């Protein structure tokens, strides 16, 4: 680091210390007595300047859950100059979403996500009170993820799932890295459904390269950033993360803009595909949507959707291989139901649906929901005050293993979703189960995921018997987790597909 930057950093740290001391004085005294307002949540004692950052080393959702066992299900942390409130139980989550959903519906935007103006045009990061967010949410609900829209391209999805099965058939008897093959197949499913383009062949080097680009971009976005801890340092971009994100986003947007440009050229000659991209470009021509919003929306679907569904499938397969009884039960249900699986069959396979739900409960792809931000005073959770401007973190991984809500919470028991008297679905209305979030910020891609993940899993279980490589037993299978923004297997799953007659 150059001498000038060291001086700037030293000055920034001095200013940070003043902020920190001012905060201590404000909470110690302040304009009203302690008895007149709820207390802040308990939490580990913060260090000057850095707060509790050193307490968060390791797998983040595991570490937060461990701290919550000491300090309680509503816990306060200090992250640089930011106050964070961590919610780790069903009851606390229910109170937050039922009483304060609107007040907590804003986002904490990481500085790297401001690259290319992404956060100002993204449904992920725009405040829910922003008219642009409401308009984009309506477009997604009407044109991308509506039952009618998804039904219109069902045959495309079924064709791409057959391609996935065909790839594994070509590798029958061989050791295959499951996640890489599934990612390629799901990538094609998403790209073909939304803009009628095969991004890559299943298992191809091109798909691997695209995934590396997305993962590199996600890593840059997820990396701890001093600009987020001390916002007045943003302009300096001391770690270069915004510059790195700018470069990766430019490459990703370039790929998508090329697809859009080719489609626009074809449309001038009357060539239409009738897919989601055509629907979005119709809105652009009608003045109801900006062209750059089309690129952003495709980027969100392409980047987040492909990875989320493929990781969910890898976890489901890993848990079935670890639990041979559950594997036999799932395959028996399929053998009794259909010789060839179609997408509509998956909804009529209750045990398969339970397997998917249980895998997502134990290993949510997003174990920590994207941070919310309190936009008003008066938010209270579990008897504790959430200050205006505070970051609110929902540890979905801990909530979905809350022993007050689940029996044997750390075990893979799909039957729990069949035995309950109240149906538990993916929509976050039962606050012990939040794989896609809840409230205003419920994941908009849920309607696609709840069709694709069970359908792909059913197709693979019907077509093959699945084995682990020689020398690996079910008991030895490593299902430890690694997390940056997605919760993936620390050791990629390797499988051997065996064709079923």
UniProtKB/Swiss-Prot annotation:
Subcellular location: Membrane
Membrane-crossing segments per the record: 5-25
GO biological process assignments: defense response; diterpene phytoalexin biosynthetic process
Membrane topology of this protein: Single-pass membrane protein
Amino-acid positions noted as binding heme in the UniProt annotation, renumbered to this chain: 443
Protein keywords: Heme, Iron, Membrane, Metal-binding, Monooxygenase, Oxidoreductase, Plant defense, Transmembrane, Transmembrane helix
The enzyme's E.C. designation: 1.14.14.122
GO cellular component: membrane
Induction: Up-regulated by methyl jasmonate.
Domain of life, source organism: Eukaryota
The keyword Disulfide bond is annotated on this UniProt entry: no
Stored SUPFAM superfamilies: Cytochrome P450
Primary enzyme class: oxidoreductase
Catalytic activity, as annotated: ent-sandaracopimaradien-3beta-ol + reduced [NADPH--hemoprotein reductase] + O2 = oryzalexin E + oxidized [NADPH--hemoprotein reductase] + H2O + H(+)
Molecular function in Gene Ontology: 3alpha-hydroxy-ent-sandaracopimardiene 9-beta-monooxygenase activity; heme binding; iron ion binding; monooxygenase activity; oxidoreductase activity, acting on paired donors, with incorporation or reduction of molecular oxygen, NAD(P)H as one donor, and incorporation of one atom of oxygen
Pfam family, one: p450
Needed cofactors: heme
Job description of the protein: Enzyme of the diterpenoid metabolism involved in the biosynthesis of the oryzalexin class of phytoalexins. Hydroxylates ent-sandaracopimaradien.
Homology family: Belongs to the cytochrome P450 family.
Name listed for the protein in its UniProt record: Cytochrome P450 76M5
Organism: Oryza sativa subsp. japonica (Rice)
